[in-house]
């Protein structure tokens, strides 16, 4: 966000960049140390640093970049886990500001959905004229790709965040087979049945007590042979990698987010 990699495109000292950008020199010095250790920066002679190979750099503005994941981890995951001791002592929880972090979370979801896209596309093959609903469509990158690939099908996306919904509208404005609506899931009233409903990275916003009600509700929105596709992280057991436990702990740290489902629960 500070375009620091651009500031280090030529060999330059930390103090010079700190002065030019009017930022804290001590923190910038620590930032450069991390950059060197992970290969984003090169340490040059006379205490100068230079940006490393461009392909290695996180690029937050590109949906295919790891930069969006790093941004979410720095803004949300790491601070939440570091706050665990205080929360346990005070018996409190953080509050997830959905509007503040909506854009970051939407970008991360869009990056991860690239992995699921081929599987979803298989559900649409063989029947080009389908009606598809994407719940929590984010910035619309997902249904944009599907709409371009299946022009005879109609795609509707609903998104609770007003700013994210507007981004989705802009991204899909050129596609006649896509419509975006700013709406809460529980307030949405479909006008017709859907052949395919997509629900990606939404489960943790729904309390465990209301998940069965949600699935019952969605089943009424499906056509006779309709399909509900759910993409979500799942909570692991004691034998799962440490990252899985840490990831699930993140959701437990917020009063308005909920634990990930177990595979058996799904």
Labelled PLM ranges:
Residues 128-138:
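Conserved class I S-adenosyl-L-methionine
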Residues 139-151:
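Conserved SAM-binding loop of SAM-dependent methyltransferases across substrates and taxa
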Residues 168-169:
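Conserved SAM-binding loop
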Residues 212-224:
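A short glycine-rich, Lys/Arg-flanked "PGG" loop and its adjoining helix->strand segment in the class I
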Residues 1-77:
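N-terminal accessory segments
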Residues 225-233:
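Conserved beta-strand signature within the Rossmann-like core of class I S-adenosyl-L-methionine
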Residues 241-262:
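Conserved Class I S-adenosyl-L-methionine
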Residues 161:
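Conserved SAM/SAH-binding beta-strand->alpha-helix loop
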